[in-house]
Amino acid sequence: MLRTSGLALLALVSAVGPSQASGFTEKGLSLLGYQLCSHRVTHTVQKVEAVQTSYTSYVSCGGWIPWRRCPKMVYRTQYLVVEVPESRNVTDCCEGYEQLGLYCVLPLNQSGQFTSRPGACPAEGPEPSTSPCSLDIDCPGLEKCCPWSGGRYCMAPAPQAPERDPVGSWYNVTILVKMDFKELQQVDPRLLNHMRLLHSLVTSALQPMASTVHHLHSAPGNASTTVSRLLLGLPRPLPVADVSTLLGDIAKRVYEVISVQVQDVNECFYEELNACSGRELCANLEGSYWCVCHQEAPATSPRKLNLEWEDCPPVSDYVVLNVTSDSFQVSWRLNSTQNHTFHVRVYRGMELLRSARTQSQALAVAGLEAGVLYRVKTSYQGCGADVSTTLTIKTNAQVFEVTIKIVNHNLTEKLLNRSSVEYQDFSRQLLHEVESSFPPVVSDLYRSGKLRMQIVSLQAGSVVVRLKLTVQDPGFPMGISTLAPILQPLLASTVFQIDRQGTRVQDWDECVDSAEHDCSPAAWCINLEGSYTCQCRTTRDATPSRAGRACEGDLVSPMGGGLSAATGVTVPGLGTGTAALGLENFTLSPSPGYPQGTPAAGQAWTPEPSPRRGGSNVVGYDRNNTGKGVEQELQGNSIMEPPSWPSPTEDPTGHFLWHATRSTRETLLNPTWLRNEDSGPSGSVDLPLTSTLTALKTPACVPVSIGRIMVSNVTSTGFHLAWEADLAMDSTFQLTLTSMWSPAVVLETWNTSVTLSGLEPGVLHLVEIMAKACGKEGARAHLKVRTAARKLIGKVRIKNVRYSESFRNASSQEYRDFLELFFRMVRGSLPATMCQHMDAGGVRMEVVSVTNGSIVVEFHLLIIADVDVQEVSAAFLTAFQTVPLLEVIRGDTFIQDYDECERKEDDCVPGTSCRNTLGSFTCSCEGGAPDFPVEYSERPCEGDSPGNETWATSPERPLTTAGTKAAFVQGTSPTPQGLPQRLNLTGAVRVLCEIEKVVVAIQKRFLQQESIPESSLYLSHPSCNVSHSNGTHVLLEAGWSECGTLMQSNMTNTVVRTTLRNDLSQEGIIHHLKILSPIYCAFQNDLLTSSGFTLEWGVYTIIEDLHGAGNFVTEMQLFIGDSPIPQNYSVSASDDVRIEVGLYRQKSNLKVVLTECWATPSSNARDPITFSFINNSCPVPNTYTNVIENGNSNKAQFKLRIFSFINDSIVYLHCKLRVCMESPGATCKINCNNFRLLQNSETSATHQMSWGPLIRSEGEPPHAEAGLGAGYVVLIVVAIFVLVAGTATLLIVRYQRMNGRYNFKIQSNNFSYQVFYE
């Protein structure tokens, strides 16, 4: 939107058509814009007047005296420039507005209007936040920038005066703009121009109403767009439909605006938008709200409000569940007979992130930041008061500290000011140096957004910088040892001189500051490497799954040391040690109810008997890697003694493993994490111990037997195991996990259940469980478990890459470079939705092998996300066909199902049969349930079981989609996850825009949900009905010239329109939901095709339009004569190079029009040194360019002698083109009779890529002017000599004829006279 006015002018002319090309003022303002006024302007203009002047000239007088000269009066006409006043009407911005591009906006000095937030600054109030500001947009949420103590700080606005009538009407307005958000930030860093343009458009469209507009948020949209959200206030309520109609005019008049959506705002959710007092109930209305006292009800309220309360009990059992790195769930109880509406608010510090109301007693929050402390306040109105309670929650993360001492800088006042230019430059350079020092695995985390780095403080001496590194779900064990390699590159920095002694990597101690952890005030905070855990000091922990957060009961008397009840060993008092690089010990505190203290190295502690049986011990981090809940809860009468029980050991990642001895058990978990936990919240199945009280009489050193094994919660990264076993003294279980893709993992536990996470998706794991006691090994149980993922196998043959022996070595640089190019090219050709799945890890591509012939790449596709397998396969096949730089042989490229049954990679138990399906398999129980001691909880053995395809994905589905802001998911306590959500038409239909046809895919689940028969569906005409059908989708296709499909084209876009209908019924009566949905595909006409470097001749390029709806595929080919030019071809100055640019797939009514072609000495199409040879679709004079055809067919051709007017030895060619569709009233042919150069302001922004180059042939100096050869020089000299000789001969002959010929020879007969002859 903020591009140059000339660019937008050309775009708008293209959009409205040539007939409206005059719709602009002389200043470039669009006549379709707002706030335009006519002004009478008087100014001086220059005009030319003809004036006759006389002067005296002396000429010859004539007569006998030739030198005599006489005066003569001579008259001549002179043209003088004079300035005269002229008045005329000029269309310009109205008073109070100024021009910005094509439109009129408020000036920047009125930023208080277009950057303001609702409400007013409080006259008196609490201390503001520490965030300094200059404008309201610098503050989070709805806070305002208010003056306070000589400065300006962010503060909560003052509440409005209470009124009985609605004081205003508020709406959410979402505007989608044709501008890439990153480009917008580059040209407008603070978005001030963007805000004032949106403000002017909205307020002008609603005139004469006095509206107020507040900018809330701008973010990147899909396919190079920007989404802006505004808060619109009107003086009186209007229906949402009326406001939407008024604002919809913006999209019709402003080319850069794609759409405008309007929604009602629930003013009751935001204290800043309603004036209801604490004793009143706020009732939301469309466009407004109503404040209701206890004695009255709103007459216009859509529902009856319960205004009487009998009791006001407090909110109890307020706990947090399912805490992850970006989400959590809160639940509570209220012992009341009334139905209450709860108001839940989430704060980050003093910033209000979200406010919501719900009638349930649970709420899920997603889209949060990792490692951040949040405060959740839940309240309800009762007995005329606000009954509330507050809970503190910190999202999971691993946090580390990096301290850097820089000696070549001094700490100054400007460096302490975070708004100064010096601080910005210093922080940017420092963070860049640290980022460059990251090892590869940490660098990948940083680029993927899973590692957040921030400067915490700057201290003197010279400059000591404290960095805080927050890691979210790294996917592998993360510890200080992982970050330690950054120290050596930092010390070698060329920008900063770093002191080795003052630079270190260490753990971030959350326990030092209460603002860094969420432990209860009645709990100890115990620091761990990368995280922390909490330990209640009371007699009861209300949430054992998150220990130390909700402590109840009496406090245990604090003591300096405690006596172990079993061993009598005195242990020292509790400490909060900090794990740093090189430390191997950790701090462990006793469980609730036991003496306080921490065992020293090599010591053991013995808890009292636990009242639970068959429980699970937490012996490692969970999959969120927080270390919380590391507290141990031992079974029944188990006793922990040093000789017989293993001692805890810590691997470099901070994971605590239990082994018999360190010498014999050094196998680490590597990427696999062990989590033994209670099964309550997670839904895992733990089997009870089969022993009774008599089982305690089992001999102490006899391994127990293992009974039935239950496998549950199988996801793409882990699963849960539980097994039956007798209870015995000194008995442990050893688990061995092996797979073909990772080393074996050995772990020991005394529990009968374990949860494994951090595994690779779609991998078959062999599990062995063995009971041990006193060094003796018992019976072994074996089973197979395959992590969930659908799998495809494929092969692609690449013609223009030669096979190298180095490809046999996967670690060689050539192999890695080729894979990097392959992945980058394939990803760049995938649609945006598929790229999002790949970025989120929902779809993974793994190269299995690279073999000869030319290059054959075999790969696997792992599909974890809830996306159709055929859609993934089709997307990758299309990407292979259109991938740039790589020439793919289509006939030898395929993607097919991966047969797990044939390859024996299924986990079906003996007695069941494996049946292969597309992307997965099923286990069928023929003849009843198998008699096998392994049971899969998600596989009911009744005929054909649902199999992997059913249970592999459901546990992975999140409650909400993580975004940039917190989002609420309203619900109650955990419910069964297998119930499918109801689909709407938008979510069930996917439109695939292809050249020459439109394809619509509809989910069958939606058709079954709405009872819509497949036979009733068609596109515009009944002949274009369902063409393909599988188990999940139906497909409908319509060609561009079939079934009444409409095609419209202008200078900018080609739009194909059809309609999805389902009113086709053989009986003539429709008994189902009727669908009448318009469908359109937009293709961008303006394309840029460049010639640049490639591995082989020819390039296919996909240029998507701004909406990503469709694309045209272009091809550029170079010839000399009829022979195509290979890569890096050399041509001479006299060679005519013929260039063809056109569409890859032929369509008779689509024409290609070249608009501009130029050459550059580098592969950068935007190189400042350019040589234009086609401009405004016509050849530029004196460039030896001849246009053969342009606008006549689906390809354009021209010839040129490129090195006849360019002195460089290497050039790259670039061309812009547009796609044109001929109609009876319009032609695409170009007329170059009235040629003019296209001005810079008329260029159009297009996508770019390079290919080439062309090289001047050897023997010609790169900078020599084009000259004549030696042969031509000889011919010219001879011709000149002949011409001179002939001219001399003619002159001599003429001279003789005019003067006669004299003969002085004496005649012999008469020698007395000389005879004269003429």
UniProtKB/Swiss-Prot annotation:
Residues 22-1272 are extracellular. Residues 314-398, 702-791 form the Fibronectin type-III domain. One of its GO terms (molecular function) is calcium ion binding. Residues 593-655, 938-957 are annotated as: Disordered. Keywords: Calcium, Cell membrane, Cytoplasm, Disulfide bond, EGF-like domain, Glycoprotein, Membrane, Repeat, Signal, Transmembrane, Transmembrane helix. Glycans are attached at residues 89, 109, 172, 322, 335, 417, 585, 713, 984, 1050. Residues 264-313, 507-552, 897-938 form the EGF-like domain. Residues 992-1235 form the ZP domain. GO terms for biological process: adipose tissue development; cellular response to gonadotropin-releasing hormone; regulation of gene expression; regulation of granulosa cell apoptotic process; regulation of ovarian follicle development; regulation of reproductive process; single fertilization. Disulfide bonds join 37-94, 61-70, 93-104, 511-525, 519-534, 536-551, 901-914, 908-923, 1157-1215. GO terms for cellular component: cell surface; cytoplasm; external side of plasma membrane; extracellular space. InterPro entries: EGF-like_Ca-bd_dom (IPR001881), EGF-like_dom (IPR000742), EGF-type_Asp/Asn_hydroxyl_site (IPR000152), EGF_Ca-bd_CS (IPR018097), Elafin-like_sf (IPR036645), EMI_domain (IPR011489), FN3_dom (IPR003961), FN3_sf (IPR036116). The chain crosses the membrane at residues 1273-1293. This is Uromodulin-like 1.
